[in-house]
Each structure stands twice: as C-alpha cells, then as structure tokens.
Amino acid sequence: MVAYPEISWTRNGCTVAKYPEISWTRNGCTVSKYPEISWTRNGCTVA
C-alpha cells in the first residue's frame, strides 16, 4: 500500500485523499460531491 499513500482502507471500505469526496464502502461507494449518485454492489443509483 506504500505505493499509493493517498489510498487508505477503512473497516468499511477505503478513501482516497486526492478525491476526498469519494468514499468506498462495504456496499459500493458514495461521492459526496454528487450525493445523488451512489454506487452499490448491484450497480449505481441516482437519487
């Protein structure tokens, strides 16, 4: 993981420091910049 210090894995997924608005979770990922879009295990949804 040292090769990618901007990526940090958490208990639920991982976050990318370079893109703080993106956070991966156990079920997919969410983009805080675009809260209406959230990726899930099955694909993605657009609120």
Curated annotation (Swiss-Prot):
Record bears the keyword Transmembrane: no
Propeptide part(s) removed at maturation, as residue ranges: 1-3, 15-18, 30-33, 45-47
Single GO cellular component term: plasma membrane
TM spans (from-to): none
Lipid positions (S-farnesyl cysteine): 14, 29, 44
Keyword annotations: Cell membrane, Lipoprotein, Membrane, Pheromone, Prenylation
Gene Ontology terms, MF aspect: pheromone activity
Site (Not methylated): 14, 29, 44
Localization: Cell membrane
Keyword Cell membrane listed: yes
Membrane topology: Lipid-anchor
The protein's role, per its UniProt record: Rhodotorucin-A is a mating pheromone in cells of mating type A of Rhodosporidium toruloides.
Official protein name in the record: Rhodotorucin-A peptides type 3
Protein's organism: Rhodotorula toruloides
